[in-house]
Amino acid sequence: CLVVKLSAEVTDLSESMRLTLKNGTGRVIACLTNCVQEGVHKGEFPVNLDAKTVTEEIYYMWIGATLLTKVGRTHAALECAMNATKERLGLN
């Protein structure tokens, strides 16, 4: 993931790059939030789901899982993130 690779390297060195990454991740989260909201409206996800909060939690979890996958060279963190995502969205 580009965000994972660049964020640790360039955010301390370049304010403009930090702001670009911040803007980009904000747009990704906004897009995913819209998808979750649409799923709630279609009855695919629980009605009581706070789409923005859930989306942020899931996004942050996947960023962490991506980092741990690189460090551990195993897919365990990604599998854990997938299971947690399904549970959080009520898909289990």
Language-model-derived ranges and their functions:
Residues 1-16:
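Amphipathic alpha-helical segments used for helix-helix packing
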